[in-house]
A protein has these predicted regions:
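Glycosyltransferase specificity loop/lid
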Residues: 1-117, 126-127, 241, 257-273, ...
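Donor-nucleotide binding loops and adjacent catalytic segments primarily
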Residues: 18, 198-281
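Short, polar loop motifs at secondary-structure junctions
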Residues: 32-38, 119-123, 185-191, 249-257
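Acceptor-binding helix/loop patch of EC 2.4 sugar-transfer enzymes
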Residues: 73-87, 139-164
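Structural motif
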Residues: 114-115, 181, 217, 281
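Active-site proximal beta-strand in glycosyltransferases
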Residues: 115, 129-145
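A short alpha->beta transition loop at the rim of the catalytic pocket in nucleotide-sugar-dependent
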Residues: 132, 279-280, 298-300
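A nucleotide-sugar donor-handling region in carbohydrate enzymes
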Residues: 147-227, 250-254
Length: 300
């Protein structure tokens, strides 16, 4: 999944899956795009188109959508399903999907991979189906049509599928659920209803050995652009005052603020493997990666 909005989860999961395939002795190609999220690939790459938010012209979307994300404007728009997320990012735009599918199909014809792994990429699922290549991928309960959907946003996808003689379900989320296997990097307690052909795989990385380091800080991550920056920073300041410790706020612009004898350090990204072993608490937006990272380090 590539998008103009800042979202580290899809790329980090794709990197982890690619690393596991590579460590198992397989050749891997990572499909990526110039979206500001894909960086430092651990395998050879294939560049694919990046969708324009809401299908806007590229010149407009490249600047306006990241700005809206940084200002937290995206967090002010109610989003009621993952299908709406795909629509907002432009992933349901018919022209984009056609272009991405053709790039992917051309590569598949040339390389004939044994399997395609889709990280919430409709284009990858459609291309693999068209080329007769098995397709598996990531999944979660909130991304199923049964959880929430908005089929009106997927008219272009249905038209594209019908042209290719493929089943065209009402919701594009059903297309993602149609993969041969959907791997859920979570657990039944957190996501009990994930649909058919789903396999819970828990942590994507080996859980770290807990070393008993002093718990001397707190970590805040409320999504990149999911809420206004001021809300995230204010949360960090309140935590520093309440807990009497340093706080790190991820997903916002770089800054350092003093709160009494402690500091609130803000940055777009932090190395969670360095901070979570020290964290007394992790305040986050409920994302799958954040939930599992907190569990793996035994952080409330």
């Amino acid at each position: 999944m590539v998008a103009r909005s800042r979202m580290g989860g899809p790329w980090s999961r794709a990197q982890r899956v690619a690393r596991a395939f590579r460590d198992g002795g397989h050749e891997v190609t990572l499909a990526w795009g110039d979206d500001g999220n894909c960086a430092d690939p651990i395998a050879p790459t294939l560049e694919i188109p990046v969708p324009s938010p809401l299908g806007l012209p590229e010149a407009i979307a490249r600047h306006t959508f990241p700005l809206a994300s940084r200002l937290g404007l995206m967090g002010r728009k109610p989003v009621r399903s993952f299908e709406e997320v795909l629509w907002l990012t432009g992933a349901l735009d018919e022209r984009y999907t056609r272009a991405a599918v053709e790039v992917l199909r051309a590569h598949m014809r040339a390389s004939r991979p044994d399997v395609v792994y889709s990280e919430f990429s409709l284009a990858a699922v459609i291309a693999a189906r068209a080329e007769g290549i098995p397709c598996v991928g990531s999944g979660s309960q909130p991304t199923t049509a049964a959880y929430a959907s908005h089929p009106r946003k997927s008219a272009g996808i249905r038209r594209l599928l019908r042209e290719r003689g493929m089943p065209a379900p009402a919701s594009s989320l059903t297309v993602l659920e149609g993969m041969r296997r959907r791997f859920i990097p979570s657990c039944p307690t957190l996501e009990p209803r994930v649909g058919e052909r789903a396999v819970y795989c828990g942590f994507l990385d080996e859980p770290p050995a807990l070393t008993g380091r002093p718990r001397d800080c707190a970590l805040v991550y409320l999504g990149a652009g999911s809420v206004p920056v001021g809300v995230a920073v204010r949360t960090g300041r309140e935590l520093a005052e309440a807990l009497g410790c340093d706080v790190y706020v991820a997903g916002v612009s770089e800054a350092v603020q003093a709160v009494g004898d402690h500091e609130v350090t803000c940055a777009p990204r932090f190395d969670v493997a360095d901070l979570l072993p020290r964290a007394r608490v992790f305040v986050h937006h409920g994302g799958q990666n954040s939930m599992m990272d907190a569990l793996s380090y035994a952080v409330p």
